[in-house]
């Protein structure tokens, strides 16, 4: 199926440029990341957002064969959210014919090329909402990483089971706050970037950073990191209304 994916991309080379191909778990799955040509918009001068199309394939049924559209901030390569509206979904079961499925791709690419401006306008709306202190940042952070606070853990001091608290994700919260103050953009857009930077570049507690990076990459495209960024984006957008 990888060769077919590359054939499909070649057929659409006027619109797509392959950026990288990543194989994981000894070839059990692959992600083929493509830039969508001439598909860049600016939130403000020098702050560009680019849209990517990622083909996901697996040979162990971990993933359906599908295409994911993701917005990226070029300034820092933050993942800024997956485009999950119904018109942006293109998924197939492995039992179906990929060649037949791919006939829908040109129309799908056209939809998403035209749709980028909607994302840009959303980010601009976030940038107009100024924040004071870190109360709103903290609320968005807790809302976005709520999955990390589910369940119980054994307290290191008392050795008894207890519910998780924000103290158990203090590393993540410290990273988000540091990102927020470093960027010096005290707006909803700045809050979103603080969280997306942490999830894109810092998330993970494995000492081996190479493993961390691979785990993050998978998680950003089709896992918890991507989910948290999507939740943060939706929450920030809701606060602009």
Language model features by range: what are they?
Residues 19-40:
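Beta-rich nucleic-acid/ligand-interaction surfaces
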Residues 3-7, 27-29, 50:
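Short, well-structured alpha-helical interface segments that form or flank functional binding sites
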Residues 27, 38-241:
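Intrinsically disordered, low-complexity regions enriched in serine/threonine
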